[in-house]
């Protein structure tokens, strides 16, 4: 279903197609990352940074939802539809890009959280 939304967005053209391309790239990034993380065999390190993974994945899901709404709103007059498009613009300009640093952190297999010791509190 997500790929159907991306395909519709790409076919629609304009800024909706740009957003569809951004979403497609983010989906690819998280899919590649997931394979890398589980392939690393370092499950303790991977799970120590689970909150960053969940946040990135959640942003990608929300981008999909905003893309669906933008596809429905594009070309329709009225404040309601313009508001939907502006909200999608905001999300794709400011929120979806946050997945890049999260994915980079996850890819680095950072041990900061895992290496914390209880007696250091």
What are these model-predicted stretches?
Residues 1-121:
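C-terminal amphipathic alpha-helical interaction region
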């Amino acid at each position: 279903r997500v790929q159907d939304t991306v395909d519709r967005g790409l076919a629609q053209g304009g800024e909706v197609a740009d957003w569809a391309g951004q979403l497609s790239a983010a989906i690819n990034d998280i899919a590649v990352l997931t394979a890398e993380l589980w392939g690393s065999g370092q499950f303790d390190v991977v799970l120590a940074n689970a909150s960053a993974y969940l946040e990135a994945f959640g942003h990608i899901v929300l981008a999909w939802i905003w893309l669906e709404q933008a596809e429905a709103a594009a070309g329709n007059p009225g404040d309601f539809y313009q508001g939907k498009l502006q909200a999608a613009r905001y999300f794709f300009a400011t929120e979806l890009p946050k997945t890049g640093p999260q994915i980079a952190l996850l890819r680095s297999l950072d041990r900061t959280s895992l290496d914390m010791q209880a007696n250091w509190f």
